[in-house]
From Swiss-Prot:
One of its GO terms (molecular function) is transcription cis-regulatory region binding. GO terms for biological process: ethylene-activated signaling pathway. This is Ethylene-responsive transcription factor ERF095. Residues 77-103 are annotated as: Disordered. Residues 13-71 bind DNA. The lineage of its organism: Eukaryota, Viridiplantae, Streptophyta, Embryophyta, Tracheophyta.
Length: 139
């Protein structure tokens, strides 16, 4: 994606990224499966980190049809013979740990604000996932 320079600063604008008044950058994406509802991706120290979080979410939702801030980082998906979504995302973020991360390889997303329905949905998903894991272990 071409980055657009702001009118009054030398900062670049990225798709899905807004600068907060206190200097941090917020990333969000619209989910077409939920009638264009905003999905909060987190708050980041740099615009580039926020843009990469947007790219990961966009690629996860839309695949090769996604309009990305850093399409060259996902080029492997188009060129590679049998690349997968995970391989493309991992290669695109080599040396990059967006939003923090633990030693177990799972990404941690910092939520600045959640409305009650989204929070309840996330909590229900976590409970269902844990119950499924327990049921699988007992079989």
């Amino acid at each position: 994606m071409e980055r657009i320079e702001s009118y009054n600063t030398n900062e670049m604008k990225y798709r899905g990224v807004r600068k907060r008044p206190w200097g941090k950058y917020a990333a969000e994406i619209r989910d077409s499966a939920r009638h264009g509802a905003r999905v909060w991706l987190g708050t980041f120290n740099t615009a580039e980190d926020a843009a990469r979080a947007y790219d990961r979410a966009a690629f996860g939702m839309r695949g090769q049809r996604a309009i990305l801030n850093f399409p060259h980082e996902y080029q492997m998906m188009k060129d590679g013979p049998n690349g997968s979504h995970e391989n493309a995302v991992a290669s695109s973020s080599s040396g990059y740990r967006g939003g923090g991360g633990g030693d177990d390889g799972r990404e941690v997303i910092e939520f600045e604000y959640l409305d009650d329905s989204l929070l309840e949905e996330l909590l229900d998903y976590g409970e269902r996932s844990n119950q499924d894991n327990c049921n699988d272990a007992n079989r």
